[in-house]
């Protein structure tokens, strides 16, 4: 039994912009689970299509019940191969990704097609499919459920990361993360408190000076 996912997303940027952002996605505030990316092969075909293969390393925190099934020294990083085919003439990009380790625990295969949105030529549509499978006897269903939930969570991060990079490339101010916003608010609160303290000291000093002047009179 294989868990299947089908989803569709829209980025409000042109295909050319999304294509450029695709190769510059990392790092971004939403991709902290992506540790490394390396291009291992690239070529242009006679019909002017760009073929690429990348190797990505991502963190892979297992659920506690899964950690009991594997030795403590099992790597918590996942190596992922990504093949992509870019057709600039038809403005399509197709990617295939799959993990090459931890395959006994779980295999996640993904296929994405990036194309011009049919309703708005200035937008880009992403059609995403994924297959989650496990060969672990007795717990394969639980592993697949976990894998599908993790995949959906990562899709959300991927889209937010895309939007962040697109905003930077287009010269807009990217939306700040909650951590950044909280940090700025904390710093601003400190500055406000410090300013209030200094003002209170100043007022106290002035009041003391006036009191002394009255006593002298």
From Swiss-Prot:
Location of the PRELI/MSF1 domain: 36-174
A matching Pfam family: PRELI
Keywords linked to the UniProt accession: Apoptosis, Lipid transport, Mitochondrion, Transit peptide, Transport
Signal peptide (residue range): none
Location in or out of the cell: Mitochondrion; Mitochondrion intermembrane space
Tissue distribution of the protein: Abundantly expressed in all tissues tested except testis with highest levels in thymus.
GO annotations of cellular component type: mitochondrial intermembrane space; mitochondrion; nucleoplasm; protein-containing complex
Biological processes annotated in GO: apoptotic process; negative regulation of apoptotic process; negative regulation of mitochondrial membrane potential; negative regulation of release of cytochrome c from mitochondria; positive regulation of cellular respiration; positive regulation of endopeptidase activity; positive regulation of phospholipid transport; positive regulation of T cell apoptotic process
One GO MF term attached to the UniProt entry: phosphatidic acid transfer activity
Subunit structure: Forms a complex with TRIAP1 in the mitochondrion intermembrane space. Interacts with OPA1 and AIFM1.
Biological role stated in the UniProt entry: Involved in the modulation of the mitochondrial apoptotic pathway by ensuring the accumulation of cardiolipin (CL) in mitochondrial membranes. In vitro, the TRIAP1:PRELID1 complex mediates the transfer of phosphatidic acid (PA) between liposomes and probably functions as a PA transporter across the mitochondrion intermembrane space to provide PA for CL synthesis in the inner membrane. Regulates the mitochondrial apoptotic pathway in primary Th cells. Regulates Th cell differentiation by down-regulating STAT6 thereby reducing IL-4-induced Th2 cell number.
Name of this protein: PRELI domain-containing protein 1, mitochondrial
Organism whose genome encodes this protein: Mus musculus (Mouse)
């Amino acid at each position: 039994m294989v868990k299947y996912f089908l989803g569709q997303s829209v980025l409000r940027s042109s295909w050319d912009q999304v294509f450029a952002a695709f190769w510059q996605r990392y790092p971004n505030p939403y991709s902290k689970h992506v540790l490394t990316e390396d291009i291992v092969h690239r070529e242009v075909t006679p019909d002017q299509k760009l073929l690429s293969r990348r190797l990505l390393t991502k963190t892979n925190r297992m659920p506690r019940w899964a950690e009991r099934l594997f030795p403590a020294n099992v790597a918590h990083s996942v190596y992922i191969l990504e093949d992509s085919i870019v057709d600039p003439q038809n403005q399509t990009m197709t990617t295939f990704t799959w993990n090459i380790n931890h395959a006994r625990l779980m295999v996640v295969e993904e296929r994405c097609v990036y194309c011009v949105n049919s309703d708005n030529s200035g937008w880009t549509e992403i059609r995403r499919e994924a297959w989650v499978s496990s060969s672990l006897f007795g717990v394969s269903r639980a592993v697949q459920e976990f894998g599908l939930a993790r995949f959906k969570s990562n899709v959300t991060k991927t889209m937010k990361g895309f939007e962040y990079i697109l905003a930077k490339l287009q010269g807009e101010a990217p939306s700040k993360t909650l951590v950044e916003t909280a940090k700025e608010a904390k710093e601003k609160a400190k500055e406000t408190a410090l300013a209030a303290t200094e003002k209170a000291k100043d007022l106290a000093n002035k009041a003391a000076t006036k009191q002394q002047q009255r006593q002298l009179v």
